[in-house]
């Protein structure tokens, strides 16, 4: 096994002993004797770091943010001077509110109440406007009934754009103007449908005010003809189950099915004049709009990012608002893989007499920051190298600086940098010569930032001025209590390293060893991959003391866990990512098997007890890994797995696999269809799935279990567990409690399992032999 020297951070001196990063002059603390318990780790970690997230306010005084006092009042505070002012008294705060947003001039608050969850990001609510000076509370709509889908303040005046019944409205000083009249079950104005919310925007809105507040760009989605998927809810949150389940019908486009069509619209707020802008970048049935961004400080120009259906070609189209003229200002062919929708376009303004916007692109093979001319032309690279920019944190147009996080040190790390788009000088804001994981949150005017150290040691947060990144102004979150708590425990020993594939690529590995690890003993091992395209599980972020830490710590279990990021995962360059294009489930299980064989070079690894467990894509990867019939893995658990990507949504799947018409053989191979690997397991295979899963439908588990049963996988090898009405997270009605107890029992039983096959009743042998042949007698 090849181990990278700089990454062999055996956190014996780190997490295991709760080292404080070198910012504080205190020595490492000693470990205790307590071991993590089930209740402390499951269903979610109870011993965990705290963090502070601030709602920065753009005002004349930089460093201001909104906080809430113990009695519920909303306070305007300055993080630097510690001065504060009560904006909303506690008795003016609506009871049971869900969220709130201040008007930009701080004269009013928009409240969301009566929250009802819809999908992953979207919800319905009532909205009220509080006039701070008058103390009056006014409903956004007089007849609202917890049915408003989204609402947003204009950046400049007293207007609110909101969506109700899939129609767009503009509220201004108590008067409401209905903008669209066609909203309904199939037409969405200003909010995304299910597939755009889940796979494209990752959010609940599809409208964008111009910086001067005079125009609104929005998208209209038409789901007419998109196939419907029906989800039954058997209990439907009732004490007594209804005789007929409630049925939720979702327009859910699966692979090669009809997608929703999308239109681009502009609204003049003052005149209420609405204009449909023709989108000609791709044909209507071959179009995905992935991003909208204003490319001006007023409302001169707005752009949208258009993809073809399978998202391997893109065009950035600029629209001149006054003339309504459209122009392709940038395009790219990414048919060597796919093009990620990073939602990173931001207007910069004038640079040496020409207007630019900033964006992230991996066209060079690595994701980097570029300046692009607003009217098209040659781009300017601001960062380069065989590492990746992860996210743009802040654009400071006055200082001509862009703040961002990157993997420059290593793909598992994150460090914060600035780059000048005037001089192209790149400057670290942290010590970028250590394996660490940072991010930052910048004040509205960019004068201050909260630096968040997120691992691998005990996290903390500090306030800095952008004028001096060497000396913190104050500590925001110390996590001293966590540090003291950890002194009581012996924690899993965590290390990071790389293993090298025969083809030359390296895979990142995170290893957890039991607290009382003895290299002369034998230990069962559980692999815990996710492994999906562009994802990352192996990082230097804080090691959550969750279920994986529990099974490592429990004296009756003492599992070693390995998390391996296979080919196709993120932050190691485009070539590494794109290797899985058109063949999901082919390379990923090969890499997991290779890693397991490398693991078995360790004398302490028990070859008879090597398991693999994954959720969602990880559940799919678990099944595909067992399907290889490698003989390395002896048991597996798939939670909420995809079993055949022809059953999953179009916009995610086709990005990586293309359509069935273009890649029929690829889809056939990607589906879990070979059963010998499951039949030959020394141990057991468990499938868990929620029947109310609106993302990865229960259909996947049903099809998978049927495939395995009909293929001859015997009852001593296979268990299927459904969770009534639970969604993809399996959280309905205490389901997660049962789920994790089942997981704990599974890994315990598998550790206790003897290598030889358990005895069977004679009638079982005869029945199995009749059904599946003499193999059942073996």
Curated annotation (Swiss-Prot):
Keywords: Aminopeptidase, Glycoprotein, Hydrolase, Protease, Secreted, Serine protease, Signal, Virulence. The keyword Signal applies. PANTHER family: DIPEPTIDYL PEPTIDASE 4-RELATED, PROTEASE FAMILY S9B,C DIPEPTIDYL-PEPTIDASE IV-RELATED. The gene is DPP4. It is found in: Secreted. This is Probable dipeptidyl peptidase 4. It catalyses: Release of an N-terminal dipeptide, Xaa-Yaa-|-Zaa-, from a polypeptide, preferentially when Yaa is Pro, provided Zaa is neither Pro nor hydroxyproline. InterPro entries: AB_hydrolase_fold, Pept_S9_AS, Peptidase_S9_cat, Peptidase_S9B_N, Serine_Prot_S9B/DPPIV. It is an enzyme of class 3 (hydrolase). Pfam families: DPPIV_N (PF00930), Peptidase_S9 (PF00326). Its EC number is 3.4.14.5. It comes from Arthroderma benhamiae (strain ATCC MYA-4681 / CBS 112371) (Trichophyton mentagrophytes). Glycans are attached at residues 84, 114, 222. One of its GO terms (molecular function) is serine-type endopeptidase activity. Residues 1-18 form the signal peptide. Belongs to the peptidase S9B family. Extracellular dipeptidyl-peptidase which removes N-terminal dipeptides sequentially from polypeptides having unsubstituted N-termini provided that the penultimate residue is proline. Contributes to pathogenicity. The keyword Lyase does not apply.
């Amino acid at each position: 096994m090849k181990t990278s020297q700089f990454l062999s951070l055996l956190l014996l001196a780190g997490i295991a002993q709760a080292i404080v990063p070198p910012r504080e002059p205190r020595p490492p603390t000693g470990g205790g004797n307590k071991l993590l318990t089930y209740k402390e780790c499951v269903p979610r970690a109870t011993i965990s770091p705290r963090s502070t997230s601030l709602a920065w306010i753009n005002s004349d005084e930089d460093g201001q943010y909104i906080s809430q006092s113990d009695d519920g009042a909303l306070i305007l505070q300055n993080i630097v001077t510690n001065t504060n002012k009560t904006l909303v008294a506690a008795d003016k705060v609506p009871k049971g509110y869900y969220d709130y947003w201040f008007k930009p001039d701080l004269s009013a608050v928009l409240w969301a109440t009566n929250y009802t969850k819809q999908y992953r990001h979207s919800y319905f609510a009532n909205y009220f406007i509080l006039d701070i000076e008058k103390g009056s509370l006014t409903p956004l709509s007089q007849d609202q009934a917890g049915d408003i889908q989204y609402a947003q303040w204009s950046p400049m005046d007293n207007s609110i754009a909101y969506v109700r019944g899939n129609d767009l409205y503009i509220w201004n000083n108590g008067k409401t103007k209905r903008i669209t009249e066609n909203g309904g079950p199939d037409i969405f104005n200003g909010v995304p449908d299910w597939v755009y919310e889940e796979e494209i925007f990752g959010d609940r809105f599809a409208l964008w005010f111009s910086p001067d507040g005079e125009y609104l760009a929005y998208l209209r989605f038409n789901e007419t003809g998109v196939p419907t998927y029906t989800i039954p809810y058997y209990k439907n949150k009732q004490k007594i189950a209804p005789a007929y389940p409630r049925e939720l019908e979702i327009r859910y486009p699966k692979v090669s099915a009809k997608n929703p069509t999308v239109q681009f619209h502009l609204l003049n707020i003052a005149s209420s004049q609405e204009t449909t802008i023709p989108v000609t970048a791709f044909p209507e049935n071959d179009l995905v709009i992935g991003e909208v961004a204003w490319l001006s400080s007023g409302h001169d120009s707005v752009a949208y990012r258009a993809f073809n259906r399978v998202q391997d070609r893109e065009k950035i189209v600029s629209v001149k608002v006054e003339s309504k003229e459209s122009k392709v200002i940038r395009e790219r062919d990414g048919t060597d893989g796919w093009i990620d929708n990073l939602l990173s376009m931001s207007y910069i303004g004038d640079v040496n007499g020409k207007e630019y916007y900033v964006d992230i692109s991996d066209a060079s093979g690595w994701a980097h920051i570029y300046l692009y001319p607003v009217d098209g032309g040659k781009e300017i690279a601001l960062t380069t190298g065989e590492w990746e920019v992860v996210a743009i944190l802040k654009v400071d147009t006055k200082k001509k600086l862009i703040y961002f996080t990157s993997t420059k040190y290593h793909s598992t790390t994150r460090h914060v940098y600035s780059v000048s788009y005037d001089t192209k000088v790149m400057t670290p804001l942290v010590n970028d010569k250590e394996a660490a994981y940072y991010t930052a949150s910048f004040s509205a005017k960019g004068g201050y930032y909260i630096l968040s150290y997120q691992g691998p040691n005990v996290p903390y947060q500090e306030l800095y001025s952008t004028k001096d990144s060497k000396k913190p102004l104050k500590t925001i979150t110390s996590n001293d209590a966590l540090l003291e708590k950890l002194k009581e425990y012996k924690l899993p020993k965590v290390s990071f390293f790389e293993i090298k594939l025969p083809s030359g690529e390296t895979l990142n590995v995170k290893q957890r060893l039991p607290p009382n690890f003895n290299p002369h003993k034998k230990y069962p091992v559980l692999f815990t991959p996710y492994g999906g395209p562009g994802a990352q599980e192996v990082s230097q972020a804080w090691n959550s003391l969750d279920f994986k830490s529990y099974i490592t710590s429990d004296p009756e279990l003492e599992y070693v866990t390995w998390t391996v990021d296979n080919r196709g995962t993120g932050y190691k360059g485009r070539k590494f990512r794109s290797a899985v294009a058109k063949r999901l489930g082919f390379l990923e299980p090969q890499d997991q098997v290779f890693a397991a064989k490398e693991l078995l070079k360790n004398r302490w690894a028990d070859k008879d007890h090597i398991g693999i467990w994954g959720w969602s894509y990880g559940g799919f990867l678990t099944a595909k890994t067992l399907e290889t019939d490698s003989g390395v893995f002896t048991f597996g658990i798939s939670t909420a797995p995809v079993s055949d990507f022809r059953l999953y949504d179009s916009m995610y799947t086709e990005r990586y696999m293309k359509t069935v018409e273009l890649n029929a053989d690829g889809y056939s191979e990607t589906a879990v269809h070979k059963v010998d690997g499951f039949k030959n397991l020394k141990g057991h295979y468990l499938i868990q799935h929620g029947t109310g899963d609106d993302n990865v439908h229960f259909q996947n588990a049903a099809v998978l279990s049927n495939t395995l049963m009909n293929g001859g996988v015997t009852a001593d090898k296979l268990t299927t567990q459904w969770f009534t009405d639970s969604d993809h997270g399996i959280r309905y009605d205490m389901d997660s409690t049962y789920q994790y107890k089942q997981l704990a029992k599974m890994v315990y039983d598998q550790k206790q399992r003897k290598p030889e096959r358990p005895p069977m009743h004679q009638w079982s042998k005869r029945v199995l032999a009749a059904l599946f042949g003499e193999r059942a007698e073996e």
